[in-house]
């Protein structure tokens, strides 16, 4: 059996690593970032503090937050318009699955002339993309469940058909991911439980998939072990 493995995403892990957002932007030569997060997170004190720190480093921080869970194509279009209006050169995608998916899609679509649905994960549709103008992405997840921060796709709903589509391109993959456990502490017990079960489901799916590789199984089993060990405590104590 022949397989290829790579882990191209740079992961910055640890408590309060979110304070390194400015450094992450500098590493990617981002001078005018678009901060993308959903309307439920934008007014939280911790998010306001992060934006305030970014404002100390950049002349201006442009924010796009006009979306909630299960984003639609029009949300991405509006975000792309904001990206171009303010002449941004990179995206900070902040939040749970929706914030990450929308941020990644905005960075990707900012360099495209086709509709987003032309890049659905079907065959070689991804080869239609203009790869030269895809903006760099920094992902900052606030939940443990989706894994979107290391994924090459976004889940976006087509509002006309009411069907959720998977939009794919290798460059959907963020260049830097900041994994700061402090950002998960304010989640409600219900959301902590739901995203924890999502993480468990991803690991079970990987372990039970027909294709086998010992590295994948090892990662999946360790993920299951960690979920069993810590999820109940996280739900109870944050």
Locate the predicted segments by residue.
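Glycine-rich nucleotide phosphate-binding loop and flanking beta-alpha elements
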Residues: 19, 98, 144-146, 185, ...
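Glycine/threonine-rich beta-strand-loop-alpha-helix active-site module
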Residues: 74-181
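ATP/NTP phosphate-donor binding region
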Residues: 1-90
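Short, glycine- and charge-enriched coil/turn segments that flank and shape catalytic ligand pockets
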Residues: 55-60, 114, 233-238
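Carboxylate- and glycine-rich phosphate/diphosphate-binding segment that chelates Mg2+/Mn2+
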Residues: 153-238
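Ser/Thr-centric signal marking residues that sit
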Residues: 9, 37, 142-146, 150, ...
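Predominant activation on well-ordered alpha-helical scaffold segments within soluble catalytic domains
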Residues: 22, 51, 62, 77-80, ...
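Catalytic cores of large soluble enzymes that bind and process phosphate-bearing ligands
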Residues: 10-13, 42, 68-71, 98, ...
